[in-house]
Swiss-Prot record:
GO terms for molecular function: rRNA (pseudouridine-N3-)-methyltransferase activity. It comes from the Bacteria. S-adenosyl-L-methionine binds at residues 62, 94, 113-118. Belongs to the RNA methyltransferase RlmH family. This is Ribosomal RNA large subunit methyltransferase H. Homodimer. Its main location: cytoplasm. The keyword Transferase applies. The gene is rlmH. It is an enzyme of class 2 (transferase). InterPro entries: Alpha/beta_knot_MTases (IPR029028), RlmH-like (IPR003742), tRNA_m1G_MTases_N (IPR029026).
Amino acid sequence: MRLHLITVGEPKLAYARSGWDEYEKRLRRYHKVQVSRVSGKTQQAESEAILKAAGKSPLILLDPRGKQFSSEKLSEYLDAEALGGHGELAFAIGGPDGHTDALRGQAKLLWSLGELTLPHDLAMLVLVEALYRAATISAGEPYHRG
């Protein structure tokens, strides 16, 4: 499956850039990965840029109002999407003000990383690590120890 990772901006802090690069590289062992960095001067402009980048791919928005997954359940969800014929999924992290209600309404799924408020850079890193962890679970590899 192809995973399209869309972020408003890119990691600014060294730890987040380094971590993103490492987990993106690891994730590419299991999936085709495309990364799009978008920007906008307003929340509306960011949402439009995310939609444009996602194209026709089902869109999964990282949003505090969304569904929370364990690593195992995320792996199961991604496997089900692949079996359901989705060749690509787009995952999007918005800017500091989040997503517009209009964009939320167009998403296939809202996914919450948890109830904690995370800095933007850390949320990006958690996204790519969570996708990598889910891929290793699906592959039956020992990275995830439950």
